[in-house]
C-alpha cells in the first residue's frame, strides 16, 4: 500500500534531517534544531534522502519525543522492522544478503534468531569475556602510558571493543585490521574519509565490505565444523539443544551485525566519554572520588548524552493512532533516540552532563521491546572497565582538541581525538 506523501511541516522548513549538511552542523546547532522539533504538536515529516540506490519513497515522520520513541519501540506489531531498520529508503535486494540481519526482522523470524543467539551466550562464555574485558582494558592503558600523547580513538577506544568482539566470535588477531576497516566502511555514512564521494563507488565499497566479512565468517565456520572451539562462531554454526541452528546466510548477516554494532557503538561512547570528562572536570572529580558507586550511573549518563546510534527506522503495518497521532499503513517513521534522550519533558536540564542523574530512562540502547540492544550488557561492561583503568590509573587524561566527528546521520561517531596526560 502506498500512501501519498503529506506536505512537509512548514514550521521547520529550515531544518532538513535528510541532508548531510544538517549533520555537518555543530552539535549545539543540531540540539537547538531538535529542541524546536520537539515543540511541535505532531511528528514533523521529511522527504527521503536522495540516493542513487532507489527512487526516493514517500518520506518519513521523525519521532523526536521520548514518549513517541518508547511507544513505537514497544509496539512492533504496528511499527515493523521488516522493511529495514537502518536505512530511511528501501534498499535493493543485494543489500539484504549481507545486511539482512535480525535488526531488520519482525517476530517470529526475529524471535527465532534472537533465541538461537541468546542461547549461544552461555553463562560460562559471558564470565570468560567479562574477565577478558578488564584484562584487555588494563593492557590498553599500559600501552597508553608507554605511548604518551596520541589519537585516543586509534589507541584506546577502538581497540577494546574490536578485540573483545573478535575474540568472542573466534576471529584471530590477523583479521582485526580488516574487520575494523570494513566496519568503518559499512558505517561511514557520508564521510569521505571512509567512503568514496562517488555514490556508485561508495555502494560498491559497502557491498564489498559486507562480502569480505561474510567470506571470513563462512571460512571460520567451516573450520569450526571440523575442529570446534570455545567461541561464538562454533556455538552459532552448530545446533542448540532444540536442534535449531543458523543457516550460513543467517550466520554471515548476524556476524556482520554483531561485529559492526559491537565495535562502533562502544568506541563512540568511550570517545565521547573522554570529551565529556574533559569538558566537565567537576563530573570527572565526582566520578573518581567514589568510582565504584558512581560508575554505573555515569555509564548510563554517557550513553544517554552520546546516543551512539542516532535513529532507527520502522514501517507502519496498519492504520493506527499512537499518542494522539494518526499513522497510515505504509508510513515510515524514524525513531530519533538522540532527540528522545534530550526531551525536556523527561530529563531535567537535558543538555547538562550529570554522572549522578537519577532516574535516567534513556533510550540510548533503543526503546523497550524486542529490539532492545542485544549487546547492552557487554557495552556497559566495556565502558566501565575502560573508564576504571583510565581514570584510576591516568586521572589527568584529557582531550586536547575538538573531536574530528564522523559525517553521518546514523552514528554519532568520532574519527580522531588527540589526547594527553600528565606524567607522574
What is the meaning of each model-derived region?
Residues 1-424:
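Cytochrome P450
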Amino acid at each position: 500500500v502506498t500512501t501519498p506523501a503529506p506536505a512537509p511541516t512548514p514550521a521547520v522548513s529550515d531544518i532538513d534531517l535528510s541532508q548531510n549538511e544538517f549533520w555537518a552542523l555543530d552539535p549545539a546547532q543540531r540540539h537547538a534544531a531538535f529542541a524546536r522539533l520537539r515543540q511541535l504538536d505532531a511528528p514533523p515529516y521529511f522527504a527521503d534522502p536522495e540516493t542513487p540506490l532507489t527512487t526516493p519513497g514517500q518520506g518519513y515522520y521523525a519521532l523526536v519525543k521520548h514518549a513517541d520513541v518508547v511507544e513505537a519501540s514497544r509496539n512492533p506489531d504496528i511499527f515493523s522492522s521488516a522493511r529495514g531498520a537502518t536505512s530511511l529508503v528501501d534498499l535493493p535486494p543485494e543489500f539484504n544478503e549481507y545486511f539482512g540481519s535480525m535488526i531488520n526482522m519482525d517476530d517470529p523470524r526475529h524471535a527465532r534468531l534472537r533465541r538461537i543467539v541468546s542461547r549461544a551466550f552461555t553463562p560460562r562464555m559471558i564470565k570468560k569475556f567479562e574477565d577478558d574485558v578488564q584484562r584487555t582494558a588494563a593492557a590498553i592503558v599500559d600501552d597508553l602510558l608507554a605511548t604518551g600523547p596520541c589519537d585516543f580513538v586509534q589507541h584506546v577506544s577502538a581497540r577494546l571493543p574490536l578485540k573483545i568482539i573478535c575474540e568472542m566470535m573466534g576471529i584471530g588477531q590477523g583479521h582485526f585490521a580488516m574487520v575494523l576497516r570494513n566496519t568503518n566502511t559499512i558505517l561511514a555514512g557520508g564521510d569521505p574519509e571512509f567512503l568514496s564521494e562517488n555514490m556508485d563507488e561508495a555502494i560498491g565499497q559497502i557491498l564489498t565490505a559486507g562480502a569480505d566479512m561474510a567470506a571470513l565468517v563462512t571460512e571460520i565456520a567451516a573450520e569450526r565444523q571440523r575442529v570446534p572451539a570455545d567461541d561464538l562462531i562454533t556455538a552459532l554454526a552448530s545446533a542448540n539443544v532444540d536442534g535449531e541452528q543458523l543457516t550460513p546466510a543467517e550466520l554471515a548477516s548476524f556476524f556482520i551485525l554483531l561485529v559492526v554494532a559491537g565495535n562502533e557503538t562502544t568506541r563512540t561512547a568511550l570517545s565521547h566519554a573522554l570529551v565529556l570528562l574533559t569538558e566537565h572536570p567537576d563530573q570527572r572529580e565526582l566520578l573518581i572520588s567514589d568510582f565504584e558507586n558512581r560508575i554505573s550511573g555515569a555509564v548510563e549518563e554517557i550513553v544517554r548524552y552520546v546516543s551512539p546510534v542516532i535513529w532507527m527506522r520502522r514501517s507502519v503495518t496498519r492504520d493506527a493512532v499512537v499518542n494522539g497521532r494518526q499513522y497510515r499503513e505504509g508510513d515510515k517513521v524514524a525513531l530519533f533516540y538522540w532527540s528522545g534522550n534530550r526531551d525536556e519533558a523527561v530529563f531535567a536540564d537535558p543538555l547538562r552532563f550529570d554522572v549522578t542523574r537519577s532516574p535516567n530512562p534513556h533510550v540510548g540502547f533503543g526503546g523497550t521491546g524486542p529490539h532492545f540492544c542485544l549487546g547492552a550488557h557487554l557495552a556497559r561492561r566495556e565502558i566501565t572497565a575502560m573508564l576504571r583503568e583510565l581514570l584510576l590509573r591516568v586521572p589527568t587524561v584529557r582531550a586536547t582538541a575538538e573531536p574530528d566527528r564522523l559525517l553521518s546521520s546514523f552514528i554519532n561517531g568520532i574519527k580522531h581525538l588527540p589526547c594527553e596526560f600528565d606524567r607522574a
